[in-house]
């Protein structure tokens, strides 16, 4: 309504609904929340790490899956950062965590894991992931609550590699 002096008039002359839409009943979705899924992923990563430490062998299939998914998600984030015209996508700090480097390096990582050779990628990854988790609170971008446990999962996997190589070389 518009009030001018003593007169009151409506802002619009008349109201007409084009479509009378009712919200659809979506039904049951996925039974687990994203946070529950990422904690299950951390549990599986810890179990695989314990298994690797117990058997003294790298389970490279787990690396293939975990770092492959990280690299594929990184391809999507990288595409959005470089080719999207939306102003908020250009400064997406998730590119520090999810980038295509693991996908590109994956064949070398798997080869070195199968041969039992030391891989400096995991040491560098530990530094990058720890740095990301430390600067996360100071970045102006708001992250989903599942980003930190996901980074922790990747950190656990890389730390397990470094610890296992250290254990094998210092028998």
What label would you give each PLM region?
Residues 19-88, 94:
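Core alpha-helical transmembrane segments of integral membrane proteins
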